[in-house]
UniProtKB/Swiss-Prot annotation:
It comes from Mus musculus. Pfam families: Glyco_transf_8 (PF01501). GO terms for molecular function: glycogenin glucosyltransferase activity; manganese ion binding; protein homodimerization activity. This is Glycogenin-1. It catalyses: L-tyrosyl-[glycogenin] + UDP-alpha-D-glucose = alpha-D-glucosyl-L-tyrosyl-[glycogenin] + UDP + H(+); [1,4-alpha-D-glucosyl](n)-L-tyrosyl-[glycogenin] + UDP-alpha-D-glucose = [1,4-alpha-D-glucosyl](n+1)-L-tyrosyl-[glycogenin] + UDP + H(+).
Length: 333
């Protein structure tokens, strides 16, 4: 169907790798809808050419250069830059209905049935289920809605500093108005929630249709061993309690995306890259100049509490399972 589309967004070359894997997984599961990727000016020309081989439409979104009120909103609230870029998906009025998917999602089976849903359909957020998670949602492009969202962003901002807070404020009736707009969790399975509710995952995880790699560490940040076809990761990392999803992401990347990157000169020698015992030595070649994450400054207990309440616990560091267990043990002794 040419009037319906899956839409994603990439704001740099690193997330473009995620978008390419997402697009490849949609194709692998034989979607009949068009595929669109919105890109910011930070995406390189060479990477944009790779995106054009996977997606039907590659659309540059430069909020600073836009002629609409998005530019004025950005001047007023510069912290919402990426959010305003994502909101541009509502301006794609050449399509009657779309499904937006973040670039850190992976499709596990055909999900074209999502187009039977109405705006705004989304799955609950694992951190606060009365809010929906904006990583996967069904929507209807509309210039009127787009302008209203821009106005809301300008006047009120976002309670979480990102698109999810803004969209939950705009579609505030989602929690109680119409249960048919609540997508089953299997359409947006959070990799972190697997760890937090393992029994449910064991019972229902086999039905997962989309996995969402939430958290600071994305699939492309791990190292991968092509000989064992598995990621090299810390067994205590809560986001990899079930690394088969990470392995599946990397399998899709090495099979479908890596050859495209090589063809366009973004990876010089894929064969020697894959012959390495580990990819850690070549990871910089695939990170396109990504700098390693800077060490996080220490925060007060009050700041840490606020981050927990906002669903931003540092599962990879201070709030890891081992650290929490160690703290509890000191109180229980």
């Amino acid at each position: 169907m040419t009037d319906q589309a899956f839409v994603t967004l990439t704001t740099n070359d690193a997330y473009a790798k995620g978008a390419l894997v997402l697009g490849s997984s949609l194709k692998q599961h034989r979607t009949t809808r068009r595929m669109v990727v919105l890109t910011s000016p930070q995406v390189s020309d060479s990477m944009r050419k790779v995106l054009e081989t996977v997606f039907d439409d590659v659309i540059m979104v430069d909020v600073l250069d836009s002629g609409d009120s998005a530019h004025l909103t950005l001047m007023k609230r510069p912290e919402l830059g990426i959010t305003l870029t994502k909101l541009h998906c509502w301006s794609l009025t050449q399509y009657s209905k779309c499904v937006f998917m973040d670039a850190d999602t992976l499709v596990l089976s055909n999900i074209d049935d999502l187009f039977e849903r109405e705006e705004l359909s989304a799955a609950p957020d694992p951190g606060w289920p009365d809010c929906f998670n904006s990583g996967v949602f069904v929507y209807q492009p509309s210039i009127e809605t787009y302008n209203q969202l821009l106005h809301l962003a300008s006047e009120q901002g976002s309670f979480d500093g990102g698109d999810q807070g803004l969209l939950n404020t705009y579609f505030s009736g989602w929690a109680t108005t119409d249960i048919t707009k609540h997508l089953p969790f299997v359409y947006n399975l959070s990799s972190i929630s697997i760890y937090s509710y393992l029994p449910a995952f064991k019972a229902f995880g086999k039905n997962a249709k989309v996995v969402h790699f939430l958290g600071r560490t994305k699939p492309w940040n791990y190292t991968y061993n092509p000989q064992t076809k598995s990621v090299n990761c810390d067994s205590q990392d809560p986001t990899v309690s079930h690394p088969e999803f990470l392995n599946l992401w990397w399998d899709t990347f090495t099979t479908n995306v890596l050859p495209l990157l090589q063809h366009h000169g973004l990876v010089k020698d894929a064969s020697s890259y894959l012959m390495m015992e580990h990819v850690s030595g070549a990871l910089s070649d695939l990170s396109f100049g990504e700098a390693p994450a800077a060490p996080q400054p220490s925060m007060s207990s009050e700041e840490r509490k606020e981050r927990w309440e906002q669903g931003q616990a540092d599962y990879m560091g201070a709030d890891s399972f081992d650290n929490i267990k160690r703290k509890l043990d000191t109180y229980l002794q």
